[in-house]
């Protein structure tokens, strides 16, 4: 089994599994129940199910930002949110400084 296949299967059985959505995004996205999801879509879904998931916020920032619960978030907004939920997230601090 590949990592992508495992994440896709996990989401087939538990569609609200935020960590699986995040990991599927890290792998570049995938298909769940016949629907194709991009990296951005995966991170947005992860945050729909767990808005406090710092890794998903960070990764959404890395890919350019996105929309969560109808609100648009820039890269900077995403890194700031990641830091709200994990103040010691070194890479989020670094990327916030780069932006």
Question: Which functions belong to the PLM regions below?
Answer:
Residues 1-9, 30-45, 66-81:
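Structural signature of tandem alpha-helical TPR/SEL1-like repeats
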């Amino acid at each position: 089994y590949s990592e992508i296949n495992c994440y896709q299967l996990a989401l087939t059985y538990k569609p609200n599994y935020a960590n699986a959505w995040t990991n599927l995004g890290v792998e570049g996205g995938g298909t769940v129940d016949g629907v194709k999801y991009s990296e951005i879509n995966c991170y947005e879904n992860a945050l729909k199910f767990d808005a406090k998931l710092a890794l998903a916020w960070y990764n959404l920032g890395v890919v350019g930002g996105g929309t969560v619960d109808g609100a648009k978030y820039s890269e900077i907004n995403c890194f700031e949110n990641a830091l709200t939920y994990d103040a010691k997230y070194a890479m989020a601090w670094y990327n916030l400084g780069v932006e």
